[in-house]
């Protein structure tokens, strides 16, 4: 199974445009499943093997969201194997996805955002880069994989726009705020000497040695500034995206526009943020109204 799994992960990355984060997690899921089925051959697998694996995960107290992801991974893997004529049918196709716990996305308030955006304050190349990354995450609501994948020619300084390659290689154009543009210019001026002049596609955000920043590098960088500011809460690059959507809706943006900015395929994915803003209104009402 291992060779088939490697081919599948390569297919995801090259043909489906899956992020580094997704391919890494799917690799973990497939290794776990391979260990569970032991020496059983792929063509001999049935839906009962998949159900047994899911039951095993439940006994190990995996969350419903983790089990759902592992099932989604297996569905995609077996679909790929059917396409490659390794299997005649997908044994995971008819298995229902466990209902996820409805968890509202966490976000930062404007004061917390301001503290984080001001955290990279040194006049160094690295902190200029870090500030522009934080500004971009909040200004345009990008996924970390989308930000890491940006190239020079994706950014339109004069128009204040950026071309983003989202999930499934779908492109969208997103505005970039003035504060983010100013930070990008400051970083840009110090960036040129470190670039790889021979690179055809020049990455927008680079490491000390001139290579493209990875998703993991951006996550580590965000954590560094969270610790520096002492905010005392769990914050990741995706928290900036949640904050972007919540603040946009708080200030009157319509749901469809926010959906387009975030690159959500379904409006229902964006609607979770309306629950966040409604909950905040209820809390404000309960704490301030004399007869609440």
Where are these regions (language model features)?
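Conserved catalytic core of the tyrosine transesterase superfamily
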Residues: 1-292
